[in-house]
């Protein structure tokens, strides 16, 4: 979660734990039986959704699972928890109840992360300061929108500066709130 917003606001802006864990790994195309390698694959489960998609031309895929999971304050403050083999194994065990065991046993470079989201849209006081990406607003992970939002917003900012249009922040806040609502609805539907 970006600390840029807190630095610019001159106050601590804390993210909100979204009661979810993201598991990210890589997997070879041959281990993804029944999945079209030329498309993004989305699987929905109970309190779980998984996505796999190609990342190169050599047959490597990213595998992402978002698992609904409550953690207490002690667990959330222990950043090393998400690197511990026991914790990762417990997350894999929960995911394996709904994902093909052939996929689970062939995952490589497995990492876990807590999912944090923004609870408010922060608008910098200085009109010449623009935040983009997670520094502006962190969405729930249902649209794979992080990178796409950053690219889209960077382009909109460029156009705004090029044409001296002053509507950038107003329109962006409206759009951010709409995307956030859709993301939360998708998360509800996916789980």
Describe the function of each predicted region.
Residues 101-106:
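Short, conserved active-site entrance elements at the starts or edges of catalytic domains
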Residues 86-88, 109-188:
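Conserved mid-domain beta->alpha element of the FAD-binding
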Residues 1-100:
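Conserved FAD-binding catalytic core of PHBH/FMO-like flavoproteins
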Residues 27, 56, 67, 96, ...:
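Generic secondary-structure microfeatures
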